[in-house]
């Protein structure tokens, strides 16, 4: 192994960067391209911010659902309507 200039930052050492740029392809060759590609593509690990999912807004005419609930009959009491016997 050849000596490395100690003044160089570790990420600038020869051999630390792949010769080709990373791509968005998920084939086997590209998944094993470099350590970053392996962790993100092959293992599916990403430490970036997660995108917030937007809640689906109901359509503008959604008031009919609320109206239909109020038109439903009230629940009927179950059991003996005269009450408990003593």
Curated annotation (Swiss-Prot):
Site (Essential for Tat translocation through the endosomal membrane): 11
Superkingdom in the source lineage: Viruses
Residues that hold Zn(2+) 2 according to the record: 25, 27, 30
Modified-residue entries (Asymmetric dimethylarginine), positions: 52-53
Entries under Gene3D superfamilies matching the protein: Tat domain (4.10.20.10)
Residues that hold Zn(2+) 1 according to the record: 22, 33-34, 37
Region annotation (Disordered) ranges: 1-20, 47-86
Bias type Polar residues, positions: 62-77
Ranges for region Interaction with the host capping enzyme RNGTT: 49-86
InterPro entries named in the record: IV_Tat, Tat_dom_sf
Keywords per UniProt: Acetylation, Activator, AIDS, Apoptosis, Host cytoplasm, Host nucleus, Host-virus interaction, Inhibition of host innate immune response by virus, Inhibition of host interferon signaling pathway by virus, Interferon antiviral system evasion, Isopeptide bond, Metal-binding, Methylation, Modulation of host chromatin by virus, Modulation of host PP1 activity by virus, Phosphoprotein, RNA-binding, Secreted, Transcription, Transcription regulation, Ubl conjugation, Viral immunoevasion, Zinc
Subunit-structure text: Interacts with host CCNT1. Associates with the P-TEFb complex composed at least of Tat, P-TEFb (CDK9 and CCNT1), TAR RNA, RNA Pol II. Recruits the HATs CREBBP, TAF1/TFIID, EP300, PCAF and GCN5L2. Interacts with host KAT5/Tip60; this interaction targets the latter to degradation. Interacts with the host deacetylase SIRT1. Interacts with host capping enzyme RNGTT; this interaction stimulates RNGTT. Binds to host KDR, and to the host integrins ITGAV/ITGB3 and ITGA5/ITGB1. Interacts with host KPNB1/importin beta-1 without previous binding to KPNA1/importin alpha-1. Interacts with EIF2AK2.
Domain notes: The cell attachment site mediates the interaction with ITGAV/ITGB3 and ITGA5/ITGB1 integrins, leading to vascular cell migration and invasion. This interaction also provides endothelial cells with the adhesion signal they require to grow in response to mitogens. The Cys-rich region may bind 2 zinc ions. This region is involved in binding to KAT5.
Miscellaneous: The infectious clone pNL4-3 is a chimeric provirus that consists of DNA from HIV isolates NY5 (5' half) and BRU (3' half).
Similarity field: Belongs to the lentiviruses Tat family.
Name the UniProt record assigns to this protein: Protein Tat
Protein species of origin: Human immunodeficiency virus type 1 group M subtype B (isolate BRU/LAI) (HIV-1)
The organism's taxonomic lineage, starting at the top: Viruses, Riboviria, Pararnavirae, Artverviricota, Revtraviricetes
């Amino acid at each position: 192994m050849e000596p490395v200039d100690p003044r160089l930052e570790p990420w600038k050492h020869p051999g630390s960067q792949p010769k080709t740029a990373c791509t968005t392809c998920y084939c086997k060759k590209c998944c094993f391209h470099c350590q970053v590609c392996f962790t993100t593509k092959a293992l599916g690990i990403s430490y970036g911010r997660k995108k917030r999912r937007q809640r689906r807004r109901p359509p503008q005419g959604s008031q009919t659902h609320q109206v239909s609930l109020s038109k439903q009959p009230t629940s009927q009491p179950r059991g003996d309507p005269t009450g408990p016997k003593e």
